[in-house]
């Protein structure tokens, strides 16, 4: 099994070291698996989608970003699309992974904290990352979907600079400002990106085995990212997968032309829902909610209801990313063996989980609750003297504003921060 994707490898360590017990070790992946039996023009085929999350630099949305010193990327996921018809098999692999630089985006109570590119040399880790990727998958096309203006601009400029300086003939860089190109729900403009990627699709090809003989091999992959490698990434990956799938079905003799797939309504519906479900699962594992923009993946168009659901999921993400993800990160680090509990920890040795909170963590929210309560009382309870009531409203309203401003100013104090492996790295 590929060690990059065995999530219970740490739990199996002692068993795997004993030859008589190693055969009982069952490797487990974290990701998404879907197997569907579908008919196309009266012929049955199996459509399979498998996504596997890497155990390296694993974690939650704002706690792990970019690369580590070994060149491992946060939220790295390998997705393989498999089609089986009788003894014939086709597959196509894509990857996603955090922007391959040293950067952070720490939760601080703001809806979207500004990303920060570290002022250190990125080249060595970048080259390590792509040396690994080229060795495993072949040539790489970096499909970068982040904004080319605003807070994300610093990441796009730095990545373009590093790719240029690397001068690696096995890597091609393809930036595409998803939000700018598709603003006002003009998602049909994604066809611009697909046209730019078609030469690479032809060049890379896909795996094909006919009657037990391998007739084609995939020569490279598309490594797609947005800032989270979730919502925009999944939309583009599903479009690339569909382009390849159409060609595969023609080669297998199941379709007469590539355009015919859109007429296979049942298959088209399953394809869209499988990719949307894949998006939701990968998103929940990293960001805590289902993916955004899945209405486009499911229906082929952007809808008002989908936009409203995106707003709802964004609120849930905000709460989880700021107030729950530290504990989730600690749980992952414990499970993966990134943090090893010391003997007598919590007894004679202090546990990192016992670290004390800053006094502001308790005082400021209490002050806000008191101020907000008094503000509501001042607004709702009538007073004989209107000017006096207005004075109370203004005073307690200002108190609410100042305490909220204080919470935002010291936002990192109020966020649920990881306490185990993350702190150990900092102390080292």
Regions found by a protein language model. Give the residues of each.
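A phosphate-binding catalytic loop at a beta-strand-loop-alpha-helix junction
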Residues: 220-239
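Phosphoinositide system proteins, centered on phosphoinositide phosphatases
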Residues: 1-215, 244-428
